[in-house]
Amino acid sequence: MTNDRLFAGIARVLSVRPLAAALALLLTLPLIGVQAQSLRPSSGLRLPTPAASAGAAAGSASGQRQADFIVAVVNSEPITNSEVRTKLVRTEQQIIQQGSPLPPRRELVPQVLERLISDKAQLQLARSAGMRVDDNAVEAAVQTVARQNQISVDELRRRLKADGIAYSQFESDLRDELLVSRLRQREVDLRVTVTEQDIDQFLREQEGGTELSSLALNLAQILVAVPENATPGQVAALQAKAQQVMDKARGGADFAALANEFSDSPTRGTGGLMGLREADRYPPLFVESTKSLKVGGLAGPIRSGAGFHILKVIEKRQAGMPGSVITQTHARHILLRLSPKQGETAATEKLAALRKRILAGQADFAALARENSEDASAKQGGDLGWANPGMFVPEFEKVMNGLAPNQISDPLVSRFGVHLIQVLERREAQMSQRDQREMARNVLRGKKQEEAYVLWAQEVRGRAYVEYRESPQ
């Protein structure tokens, strides 16, 4: 279960060309969800403020004031220059962390503005449809951000303040992301269907092919970031740290747990997973390092402009074609369904209390699942058995994939209700023909969802009234 592009198998990806990389990234930036709100421990939050961005450009208080002018109006709501600057710097940071070269700002800025316009139009549509995200869902998202960065909520507040970011604005941004993500689920994802004929045709089309252009990879990474202007001594120390992490991975340590503990990449909260992509849409450095590896193989540390990367091959197959070896997950969950008598806030609070009892050793997960879960798995203590990739809805699977064995998630909301998830173990397994067809179904569903989303987003954007404003002289 994953959401906004939360379908791990078909995530939008970076091209090897700088501008194409930026455009592909822009398609995922606004709704990447709370897992992308990552902090880099060495430097605090990597989320620049409008004032900081403007100050870097103008270097004066007057420059900061100038950054507040309106650059566009979307159905009467303004987009300011400071918003564009903030989104621009975030985009550039993520491009760098992905190991791709930066395009010129003169090419990137117009695309950032257009993305902000599209996001604004979608947010307005969600609000006009009466969709809401309650305070408890936002607080759960904040806790997820803190947990993924291995800090407390109080420490998160401190880092936000140190970087000049108002906590209220941070919460507002999370609320907007959750709201538009739910709109996409309702308007796009749930309306996509895949027929048996679609699967048959897909499998026929994907048979054969050995060229790099037909190869698909699903990689996970751990990034040990190297700051700009680092001294040779600092670089050597960070390289040694990366090598130590690599040694742990080769020694059998869980890669997702290592990513959560050591990685400076935004993917740390999801176990380092970067999603299934055509090989030529990964950075060439990553492809060269992993193309000869088998599933489960490790590469690194590899040096890029962002730092030192450690890579693991999660899946490897012909593009779009289910592979023969997959990573299965054994998990269990507690589900509380939403109803007039049990709203999202109440369900989330109840599951948070159950999680606290389990972590304190006061209760057993399976016993609580039998007593409280409203899923068919309750009788089995919430046990979901061994699951192949794509078996659960995206918003569920995204969180599950980011958990290390025995780790328990925070309460998360899916289209079925509110869940508490615990991953028990993982293994690599050979897929049956039935499993391959199911995998093909999920790949097709993801592709169709992406195609449908692009068309839907264009329609929403096309219906919006947009007025561009000239910058003050």
From Swiss-Prot:
Which cellular component terms (GO) are annotated to the entry? outer membrane-bounded periplasmic space
| Entry keyword DNA repair | no
Q: Source organism's superkingdom?
A: Bacteria
Which GO BP terms, alphabetically?
Gram-negative-bacterium-type cell outer membrane assembly; protein folding; protein stabilization
> For this protein, what is the EC number?
5.2.1.8
Q: Which residues form the signal peptide?
A: 1-36
The portions of this protein that span the membrane are none
**UniProt keyword Cytoplasm present:** no
Q: Which InterPro entries match?
A: OMP_Chaperone_SurA, PPIase_dom_sf, PPIase_PpiC, PPIase_PpiC_CS, PPIase_SurA, SurA_N, Trigger_fact/SurA_dom_sf
Instruction: Using the UniProt record, give the first listed, main subcellular location.
Output: periplasm
The PpiC domain is annotated at 214-315, 326-425
Query: What UniProt keywords apply to this chain's record, in alphabetical order?
Result: Chaperone, Isomerase, Periplasm, Repeat, Rotamase, Signal
Catalysed conversion reaction: [protein]-peptidylproline (omega=180) = [protein]-peptidylproline (omega=0)
One GO MF term on file is: peptidyl-prolyl cis-trans isomerase activity
Q: Subcellular localization, per the record?
A: Periplasm
Domain notes for this protein: The PPIase activity resides only in the second parvulin domain. The N-terminal region and the C-terminal tail are necessary and sufficient for the chaperone activity of SurA. The PPIase activity is dispensable for SurA to function as a chaperone. The N-terminal region and the C-terminal tail are also required for porin recognition.
Its biological function?
Chaperone involved in the correct folding and assembly of outer membrane proteins. Recognizes specific patterns of aromatic residues and the orientation of their side chains, which are found more frequently in integral outer membrane proteins. May act in both early periplasmic and late outer membrane-associated steps of protein maturation.
According to UniProt, the name of this protein is: Chaperone SurA
Recorded name of the encoding gene: surA
